[in-house]
Amino acid sequence: MDSISDIIYKGLKVSSRGWDRTRRYTKRYIFNKRSTNSKYLVMILAGYQDYVWDDVFKRISNFVPENYDVCIVSAGVRKEKLEKIAEKYGWSYLSTKANKLAMALNTTIKLHPKAEYIFKLDEDIFVGEHFFDELLDTYHFANNDGIYKIGFVAPVMNVNGASYRYFLKKIGCLSEYEEKYGIARITCDDDNVFKNGQSAKFLWSKSFPFDDIVNLFLNNQEKEYFTSPIRYSIGAILIHRERWNEAGGFISSGNGQLAWDELELCRFCMNSSSAIIISTKVFAGHFGFGKQKADMIPFYEKNKEKFGLFN
């Protein structure tokens, strides 16, 4: 007999996504397939922030293991430049007719039926050495630990409400940040880390030399991971196929509303007692949230060489 919590959870699953399950995938897409049926899949959601593509994709290409399948995913647009980047690096490219991010991601996973470990990256995420294998190691470490059922695993990111405080403490800049912007509150929305462009610039200024910061985290002697107590911004995550399937896939609002897939995935993790694991061994840079772009784009152009490889 189901407990009250089981009944409530089942009801939440039906109400939050039952109507949308038949629209989880789309048949209206263009797929340039170069997959190798790997059990590791990297999906890069891209199509709108071309000003960072050269550095972002060069970094991914340099650090992704050779036995991984990589697919650039565009929802609602088809970009010739992205097709050429995919061809250059031997990756697949998927473009869907509908501008629905969750549907595009689900379709990508469906087109890679052998993929068990699924990395989802946004187009404005900067990765470093051992990003993929260390994140995978953290997944296995936390899984073997047995303390938590894992929802998904993520890196420490600089511009991220769940992890920036840890980042600032690790590099010894927490007090300096709080003198400028107030308490570094762990939050996912209405705070400086989310909406203040100057805050994003500060966090990035402390992320250089980028690959030295990556190595600082790789050599971290602290506990392998911590858990996020709040909704996590899913610009860079690793999720197992079983957990993705249990969640009903990535879920859209039905009208293309941004971040709905994030909201529903975090809701699923909470309702199913699945932990959001943040690896203390992996650092990645997030360019910034929407309200921060006006300040971040000029900052990026002025400091472009620092975002490149080994700078």
Model-derived regions: residue spans:
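N-proximal low-complexity "stem/linker" segments adjacent to membrane-targeting elements
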Residues: 2-58
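C-terminal catalytic/acceptor-binding lobe
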Residues: 14, 24, 199-311
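Short alpha-helix within the catalytic core of nucleotide-sugar-dependent glycosyltransferases
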Residues: 57, 115, 129-141
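Short, acidic, metal-binding catalytic loop of nucleotide-sugar glycosyltransferases
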Residues: 58-67
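A conserved acidic beta->alpha catalytic loop
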Residues: 72-82
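Active-site nucleotide-sugar/metal-binding loop of Leloir-type enzymes
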Residues: 106-117
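Short beta-strand-to-loop acidic/aromatic patch adjacent to the donor-nucleotide binding site
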Residues: 115-126
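Conserved catalytic core of nucleotide-sugar-dependent glycosyltransferases
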Residues: 134-241
